[in-house]
């Protein structure tokens, strides 16, 4: 149970980090949040 939660959290953080990097490079201010 804890193992699955750990992997889910790790995957979520990893995906979020990738998304932030991609938005930071491709957005260039066009996607202004």
Curated annotation (Swiss-Prot):
Keywords, comma-separated and alphabetical: Electron transport, Membrane, Photosynthesis, Thylakoid, Transmembrane, Transmembrane helix, Transport
Transmembrane annotation, as ranges: 2-22
InterPro entries on file: Cytochr_b6-f_cplx_su8_sf, Cytochrome_b6-f_cplx_su8
GO biological process: cytochrome complex assembly; photosynthesis
Membrane topology listed for this record: Single-pass membrane protein
Disulfide bonds: none
Predominant cellular place of this UniProt entry's protein: membrane
Record keyword Repeat present: no
Transport listed as a keyword: yes
GO cellular component: cytochrome b6f complex; plasma membrane-derived thylakoid membrane
Cellular location(s): Cellular thylakoid membrane
Subunit-level organization: The 4 large subunits of the cytochrome b6-f complex are cytochrome b6, subunit IV (17 kDa polypeptide, PetD), cytochrome f and the Rieske protein, while the 4 small subunits are PetG, PetL, PetM and PetN. The complex functions as a dimer.
UniProt record similarity statement: Belongs to the PetN family.
Biological role stated in the UniProt entry: Component of the cytochrome b6-f complex, which mediates electron transfer between photosystem II (PSII) and photosystem I (PSI), cyclic electron flow around PSI, and state transitions.
Name used for this protein in its record: Cytochrome b6-f complex subunit 8
Organism: Prochlorococcus marinus (strain MIT 9301)
Gene: petN
